[in-house]
Amino acid sequence: VRICGKSVGEPSPTKCIRQKMGFISENRKEFGLALNLPIRVNVTHAGLKEIFPSGIVDVKKERRLAEEYRQKLRIATPDIERNVVSLSGGNQQKVVLAKWLSTNSEFLVFDEPTRGIDVGAKEEIHRLIDELARQGVGILMISSDLPEVLTLSDRIYVMREGQIVKEIETVTAETTQEEIIAYATGGDRSDA
């Protein structure tokens, strides 16, 4: 695995965090959150070494950071001490994003970023992804939601059976869902 041209060997969560990478899983409940812990803890736990280099958690600093991300990402909750399990799916997804932003991630992998969230939350996540990209954060989005792919992507890699079969270098108004489906299924591109 190479990150920014440097070989990092076998990836691990620690190596990825050290390389300023974050991963927003499609299964936030299993791989992204500690559901029975407060929002405050979920926001800071991936970056404990960076946020608290002494190894001692400064709860006031932790609260300030969590509150900053609650406001910045518009996480709908009156209290960062609430357990994440009490939040809606869209707000849980924002907590996962806040966790990785608190580590100063320069590259984020979004795996099905809006699966299982309502339309309003979906639009908010799209806005956040777009804003991060404009700020220079590298974004790799894996999605089966083709309208989402077409809306948010500058470049699309179409895969079939684990292999890249097409690179669409510039996404334009002429790029269609049918074209992507044709490449993904091995269909005739002229049908698109």
Set out the residue ranges of the language-model regions.
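Glycine-rich phosphate-binding loops of nucleotide-dependent enzymes
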Residues: V1-A192
